């Protein structure tokens, strides 16, 4: 049994995706594409449940979970074990396979995050969607799923609709330079338009004044959640660097803190365990579930223990982590290193005490 409990485990049921988003490293991922076999998934879920290893299990890392051939069986398996399951989807199958809408509602999954990201036809171009899926079809499928879930009195699924915020931020090194939604005015305009669209006919819709006040609190360039109803929230997230993988010059971090292996871990579809959701290519393999238990990998074996011990001493020793936590200038690298300590050691604990559930994916 692990001597500590993770906040979340990212469980990648597949790394196959039907989108090729410009802001995602899918195009440069070198791993073989594939799906997790059911016996391996069952082993992972059994151990997580038996030892209460994580507060949240998320079908999330790379790939699109809703094109996993066994996705609804996988959801049922997780929920049958009493796991707090979250799922992140691009939402494309809500139009391509409309039966997915009601099937997902019927599962009773606690939370679904829809990576809308690009909220209009112009920005949808950067998603690399299948050619037969037009922007309005994509938006309509998502809209119908959200409305159906809101209208279903038997569903307690909470949906987060995620928007990509490309407002420049001093702590971030973008994966690529792009413009989707930038600044307070543009983001508030998009949030308002989508709130009106999703809540049309909803009995729990806030008053217009209340809705505008909630959206007016949005601050650009940071992660934020705006609750619309108990079952629906809008979420904004800044453009990320994916570990500075494509930056030509990076000043590596030498100190700082990351919650990889202490608060989170990932399980890739082939059973490889990685320290965090950003290790999309399995560059820091901690072990494999086919050979060892998750408890052994996280709490006994040297790779995870060494990484965690280093971060606990505010040391960044792994070269992949050094690059991820570094930046393209000395000043920004220093800001990011100091900021990582301030965020994880001060800001994050305070926010979790003030707002239970804060920081959940």
Residue positions per predicted region:
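Short catalytic/ligand-binding loop motif for oxyanion handling, primarily in non-cytosolic enzymes
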Residues: 20, 31-33, 66-68, 95-96, ...
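C-terminal accessory region of radical SAM enzymes
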Residues: 145-158, 196-253, 272-273, 278-328
